């Protein structure tokens, strides 16, 4: 009797030289950057992301000694505008090359992490193909989206945790949270992962203790040296960046970098299941309360995932990001990159038949297509299709939840993911 081949065995059937794959991925991204120049000059629909022009304008204000927040709709850390000042001094393409470089750095970190997990070079590179030759990250970074920077910071954090360099990991984590708010959800699984684990005999003795005693023991182990070091260094990094930019730019830095994203209620159509509710209640006195209440499902699911899967930190962070994006108040296509950059690390431990994986992938694209159809009619024909967009968003939510359930049910924790002692 033959068993269905899972995607790990399917990848092993290919001989993938790492240098060749990275070279092709680099050339493809460079070609897309220059194609974007051509399309921007010749076609009505521009290739370059509108946010890239916002970044460049903000960088221009920085070069003039003024605030980047003089540019309307700039809702990012000033650090990004500082990094893109060569857009003004050298070439407007500098930022795109920076983003595709971070894109490739993300792939390299994926490769190194897979090697640390015990995979061979050929198999590790085979999994990296799902990022290197994925058209979505290729298009997003070459269009001028900065999410590849955050992806590389998140992967750097996980890499240095695996290498047991806790202080280095904490520095990168502090930068990641400063650049984007979503990695802050990783702090609980990271802390649980770094705390010392009890042996079997200690577990048996602990089971006879009261709830208060078990809670005290849990908190005591949570205050281990590794956890305290990580929290202290990450906190100092984040606070130092925030204090420095607050000193220079004042309240507008806090408002546009942090508070805007915490209280954001985007009533424009997007993939979020909440958008239609927020759209209909935009003028209601309950609008703000409903927006805050939307965090509750995220909080419950993220907490459950943390305690269930913290031993495999990479898998736990993948679940965290997928849950955060799926149940967020705002969800656009670029948000998918937040968890797709972790998918190659998860794939070796998800023993799923490749045919089922292909079916799930097709459903994922079908869900987006069903949403894009009424969204196109709304944007370009001006017809009221909000209800259909919302229903398509609910269907896409169902698809994403089904995919997550399938990934969890086929997840097999390997011996390669055994706990590392940090103390």
Curated annotation (Swiss-Prot):
UniProt-annotated location(s): Endoplasmic reticulum membrane
Which pathway, metabolic or otherwise, does it act in?
Glycolipid biosynthesis; glycosylphosphatidylinositol-anchor biosynthesis
Q: Which residues lie on this side of the membrane: Cytoplasmic?
A: 1-17, 111-169, 246-287, 351-357, 406-423
Bilayer disposition of the protein: Multi-pass membrane protein
Family classification: Belongs to the PIGM family.
Q: What does this protein do?
A: Catalytic subunit of the glycosylphosphatidylinositol-mannosyltransferase I complex which catalyzes the transfer of the first mannose, via an alpha-1,4 bond from a dolichol-phosphate-mannose (Dol-P-Man) to the glucosaminyl acyl phosphatidylinositol (GlcN-(acyl)PI) intermediate to generate alpha-D-Man-(1->4)-alpha-D-GlcN-(1->6)-(1-radyl,2-acyl-sn-glycero-3-phospho)-2-acyl-inositol and participates in the sixth step of the glycosylphosphatidylinositol-anchor biosynthesis.
Q: How does it assemble?
A: Part of the glycosylphosphatidylinositol-mannosyltransferase I complex that is composed of PIGM and PIGX. Interacts with PIGX; PIGX stabilizes PIGM.
**What is the official name of this protein in its record?**
GPI alpha-1,4-mannosyltransferase I, catalytic subunit
Q: Which organism is it from?
A: Mus musculus (Mouse)
């Amino acid at each position: 009797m033959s068993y269905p081949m899972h995607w790990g065995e399917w990848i092993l059937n290919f001989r993938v030289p790492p240098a060749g794959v990275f070279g092709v991925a680099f050339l493809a991204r460079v070609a897309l950057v220059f194609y974007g120049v051509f399309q921007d000059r010749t076609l009505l629909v521009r290739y370059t992301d509108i946010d890239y022009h916002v970044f460049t304008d903000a960088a221009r204000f920085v070069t003039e000694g003024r605030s980047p927040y003089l540019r309307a709709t700039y809702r990012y850390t000033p650090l990004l505008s500082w990094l893109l000042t060569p857009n003004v001094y050298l070439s407007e393409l500098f930022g795109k090359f920076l983003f595709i470089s971070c894109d490739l750095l993300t792939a390299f970190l994926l490769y190194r992490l897979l090697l640390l997990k015990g995979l061979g070079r050929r198999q590790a590179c085979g999994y990296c193909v799902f990022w290197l030759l994925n058209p979505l990250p290729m298009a997003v970074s070459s269009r001028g989206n900065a999410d590849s920077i955050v992806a590389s910071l998140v992967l750097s954090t996980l890499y240095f945790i695996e290498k047991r360099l806790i202080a280095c990991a904490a520095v990168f984590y502090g930068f990641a949270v400063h650049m984007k708010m979503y990695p802050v959800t990783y702090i609980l699984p990271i802390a649980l992962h770094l705390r010392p684990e009890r042996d079997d005999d200690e577990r048996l003795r602990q089971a006879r203790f009261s709830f208060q005693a078990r809670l005290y023991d849990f908190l005591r182990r949570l205050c281990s040296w590794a956890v305290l070091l990580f929290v202290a260094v990450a906190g100092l990094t984040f606070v130092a960046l925030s204090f420095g930019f607050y000193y220079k730019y004042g309240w507008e830095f806090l408002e546009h970098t942090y508070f805007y994203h915490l209280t954001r209620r985007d009533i424009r159509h997007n993939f979020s299941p909440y958008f239609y509710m927020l759209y209909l209640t935009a003028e209601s006195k309950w609008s703000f309360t409903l927006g805050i209440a939307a965090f509750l499902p995220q909080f419950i699911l993220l907490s459950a995932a943390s305690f269930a899967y913290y031993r495999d930190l990479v898998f736990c962070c993948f679940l965290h990001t997928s849950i955060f994006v799926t149940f967020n108040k705002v969800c656009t296509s670029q948000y998918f990159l937040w968890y797709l950059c972790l998918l190659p690390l998860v794939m070796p431990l998800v023993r799923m038949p490749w045919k089922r994986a292909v079916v799930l992938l097709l459903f994922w694209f079908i869900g987006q297509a069903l949403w894009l159809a009424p969204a196109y009619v709304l944007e370009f024909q001006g017809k009221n299709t909000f209800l259909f967009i919302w229903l398509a968003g609910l269907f896409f939510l169902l698809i994403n939840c089904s995919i997550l359930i399938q990934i969890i049910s086929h997840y097999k924790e390997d011996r390669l993911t055994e706990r590392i002692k940090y103390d």
